[in-house]
């Protein structure tokens, strides 16, 4: 096959949720040339559950994905669904080829800062949140000057300071000010000052 094809699927759909159903599906698609499958370890209810409920209500069955990989060592099997930390990701990597982080990475994007060190052996320290924000400023400025809106970017970094002091103030400032017409990178600078300003001031005072 000249173009790589990947498939993302659930472990089952409605009443077609046996291991035999999953095996039949994967074997058929693999027979057509697909070598990579990203498998969400929940079944999907197409009738009766909303998309949001389908992400939370059906129980997770990681073991079924592990058994799929064991049955198909020649395929790349990537597991997805409810994985909330790098510790969990490492545990899954003992059984499958890859891990996909969805909501966890979106709600706490700085979670990814440790991936290279923890999972890929990179010895360099990760960029700080402050450095990430500073790098984002010129990018956001170009986006706005090209006709985009600040909120197109700001809404994706609400969780950057997840679990850190003053994270709520950071989120609130972006949520309130970034959607407004005419909002520019000053909103990002103000949000950054809310979380890092007090810390930087205390460091300067200690010198």
Model feature map: region roles:
Residues 7-11, 40-43:
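Short, structured patches in soluble enzyme cores that scaffold and shape functional sites
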Residues 9, 45-49, 137, 154:
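General secondary-structure edge motif
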């Amino acid at each position: 096959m000249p173009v790589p094809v990947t498939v993302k699927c659930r472990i089952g759909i409605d009443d077609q949720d046996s291991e035999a159903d999953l095996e039949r599906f994967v074997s058929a698609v693999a027979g057509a040339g697909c070598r990579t499958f990203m498998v969400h370890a929940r079944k999907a209810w197409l009738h009766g559950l909303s998309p949001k409920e389908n992400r939370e209500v059906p129980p997770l069955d990681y073991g079924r994905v592990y058994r799929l990989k064991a049955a198909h060592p020649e395929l790349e099997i990537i597991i997805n669904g409810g994985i909330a930390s790098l510790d969990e990701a490492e545990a899954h990597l003992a059984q499958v080829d890859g891990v996909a982080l969805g909501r966890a990475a979106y709600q706490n994007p700085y979670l990814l800062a440790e991936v290279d060190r923890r999972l890929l052996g990179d010895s360099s320290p990760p960029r700080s949140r402050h450095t990430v924000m500073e790098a984002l400023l010129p990018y956001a400025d170009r986006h706005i000057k090209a006709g985009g809106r600040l909120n197109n970017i700001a809404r994706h970094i609400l969780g950057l300071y997840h679990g850190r002091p003053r994270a709520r103030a950071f989120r609130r400032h972006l949520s309130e000010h970034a959607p407004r017409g005419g909002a520019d990178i000053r909103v990002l600078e103000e949000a950054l000052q809310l979380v890092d300003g007090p810390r930087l001031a205390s460091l300067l005072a200690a010198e």
